[in-house]
């Protein structure tokens, strides 16, 4: 059933609100701070937590993998944005802001990893 129409529909149904919410969150932070990093960081950390949770629940529960497709791949997959993070990092490097770029990279990766582990722990053991 991999790649079937019902699976694609589940992913698509989750993707639309996930992408819309990402746009809203990132645009909300844009006027408050001179750089867009905070909105991107927030959606990526929230998505990392949620994906960890969905993964753990999918592994430990007898629930249908449809939830993992709808929420994990669809909603939280489009809420998060690795490509925007990388472009923001590149812009910092191009501007010569090496310390800001390093801080952005470290904070994003460490916070995302902690969030994913916390979500997974909650789903698996909580």
From Swiss-Prot:
This is Fluoride-specific ion channel FluC 1. It is a multi-pass membrane protein. GO terms for cellular component: plasma membrane. GO terms for molecular function: fluoride channel activity; metal ion binding. The gene is fluC1. Na(+) is not transported, but it plays an essential structural role and its presence is essential for fluoride channel function. Fluoride-specific ion channel. Important for reducing fluoride concentration in the cell, thus reducing its toxicity. Belongs to the fluoride channel Fluc/FEX (TC 1.A.43) family. It catalyses: fluoride(in) = fluoride(out). It is found in: Cell inner membrane.
């Amino acid at each position: 059933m991999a790649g079937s129409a019902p699976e694609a529909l589940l992913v698509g149904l989750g993707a639309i609100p996930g992408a819309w919410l990402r746009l809203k969150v990132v645009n909300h932070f844009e006027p408050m701070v001179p750089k867009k990093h905070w909105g991107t960081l927030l959606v990526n950390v929230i998505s990392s937590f949620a994906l960890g949770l969905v993964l753990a629940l999918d592994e430990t529960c007898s629930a249908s993998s449809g939830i993992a497709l709808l929420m994990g791949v669809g909603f939280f997959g489009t809420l998060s944005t690795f490509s925007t993070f990388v472009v923001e990092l590149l812009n910092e490097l191009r501007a010569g802001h090496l310390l800001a770029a390093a801080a952005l990279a470290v904070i994003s990766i460490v916070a995302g990893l902690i969030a994913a582990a916390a979500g997974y722990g909650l789903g698996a053991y909580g």
